[in-house]
Amino acid sequence: QATAEGFRVAAHNPAIIGTLSITLVANMFFFTYAPLIPVFAEKVLGVGPTLMGLLGGAHGLGAFIGAGFIALQSKINKRSGYYYKGTLVALGGLFIFSLSQVYTLSFAALVIAGMGIAGFATMQPALIILSSDDATRGRILGIVSMTIGILPLSMVLVGGMAAILGPALAIGISSGVGVALTAILSFYAREMRKL
């Protein structure tokens, strides 16, 4: 009953719908690349375990830089800007990564992607808190957790696509679709963009 009430509240709040939609897109099309890093490093970039490990940490390095930048801001007027623009930067960086066959470019692209996803990750709960009341906030945050739960299924789908098309094309298609969907959703999520 509490969950159903949370869905009812979310369905009538355009700002929450926008936030949840972009959360769904990020978990379907961005985070799914991580299990493919070893395959990408070996088959596309032709590097060994050490450079593959560094490549796997590039996203985290970028996220650390991005989160630090946000933390240093004395005042943030448009939290939604960090959220949806950060998601676009993250998916755009991942798309560049999918096209790269040069290690340094691949590493840089993932650092940029990590910087973008920091905006998504830091502002996601903030937007939910700003657009919900005390009585329903916990339920709405529960729905956020449910949307994050799409990630394992998405990983299976992208992994299957990589088995057929190769890791680069699978990541490219996934991130490209993610960029398009995020741009469309951000355009229509006017109430979310006010936050």
Task: Give the residues covered by each predicted segment.
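C-terminal transmembrane bundle of multi-pass solute transporters/carriers
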Residues: 4, 11, 25, 37-195
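Juxtamembrane intracellular "pre-TM" segments in multi-pass secondary transporters
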Residues: 1-21
